[in-house]
Amino acid sequence: MRRYSPPYYSPPRRGYGGRGRSPPPPPPRRGYGGGGGGGGRRGSSHGSLLVRNIPLDCRPEELREPFERFGPVRDVYIPRDYYSGQPRGFAFVEFVDAYDAGEAQRSMNRRSFAGREITVVVASESRKRPEEMRVKTRTRSREPSGSRDRSHGRSRSRSISRSRSPRRPSDSRSRYRSRSYSPAPRRRGGPPRGEEDENYSRRSYSPGYEGAAAAAPDRDRNGDNEIREKPGYEAEDRRRGGRAVSRSPSGSRSRSVEVSPR
């Protein structure tokens, strides 16, 4: 016969439940005005309220009086401008209990105070010290100059990039093609362009081109681009000794010795 063994019972862990202890409170709900301090935003558990649109000549004692009806108030702080010393038109009211702060927020929001309609919301943070407010105002005053420098640098870089940008290659290419491939006007009365270029290439690449170029001032050219000698050369050669120099059309010299009868 098997013995009956009761199920194993694990003792509760410390800090969560157990004898004589209550479970932990639920997390606060999101939004304004929930249980336990009026919302689950950061800093709502400290019981600080932000009061906007208060008169500039309002004193902390005057603002403390209507809020003390909901519970004990720890502090009332009215921020002032660091340079001018004038109030900035809003205040922080900090309660001892966060629940009292939630009740005051629901009751005092959109109420009339000193002839003005005030707005009461749960502060996202506790009130700042004067040193923190001083640093914040300095950073705000420096922002416009920095933004101007950034915008100036941006416009300068854009102008430099525009000035350094090359021209469009398509336009230059089209202009070059229009100039290089346009046919030249045909001359009247002369030989065609192709024949003249062919004759020029024959003359320029002939072996005796250098000699022909040296004697170019003393030669005449006819219509068929043939080079002929002037009559003065033959008479002069006969006087010198009967030697006649005949020149070929290609520009090379060939000497023939003629013996005159004596």
UniProtKB/Swiss-Prot annotation:
Ranges of compositional bias, category Gly residues: 31-42
Subcellular location(s) of the protein: Nucleus speckle
Gene3D superfamilies (alphabetical): 3.30.70.330
InterPro entries per UniProt: Nucleotide-bd_a/b_plait_sf, RBD_domain_sf, RBM, RRM_dom
Any GO molecular function: identical protein binding
Keyword field contains Transmembrane helix: no
Biased composition (Basic residues): 153-167
Segments of skewed composition (Low complexity): 1-14, 243-262
PROSITE patterns: RRM
GO cellular component: cytosol; nuclear speck; spliceosomal complex
Keyword Protein biosynthesis listed: no
Modified residues (Phosphoserine): 5, 10, 22, 182, 204, 206, 254, 256, 260
Domain RRM: 47-125
GO biological-process terms attached to the record: mRNA splicing, via spliceosome; RNA splicing
Compositional bias (Basic and acidic residues): 125-152, 217-239
Chain spans, region Disordered: 1-48, 123-262
Pfam families, alphabetized: RRM_1
Subunit structure: Component of the spliceosome. Interacts with RS2Z33, CYP59, CYP63 and CYP95.
Family to which this protein belongs: Belongs to the splicing factor SR family. SCL subfamily.
Other facts: The splicing pattern of the pre-mRNA is regulated in a tissue-specific manner and by development, and changes in response to various types of abiotic stresses.
Name of the protein in question: Serine/arginine-rich SC35-like splicing factor SCL30
Lineage: Eukaryota, Viridiplantae, Streptophyta, Embryophyta, Tracheophyta
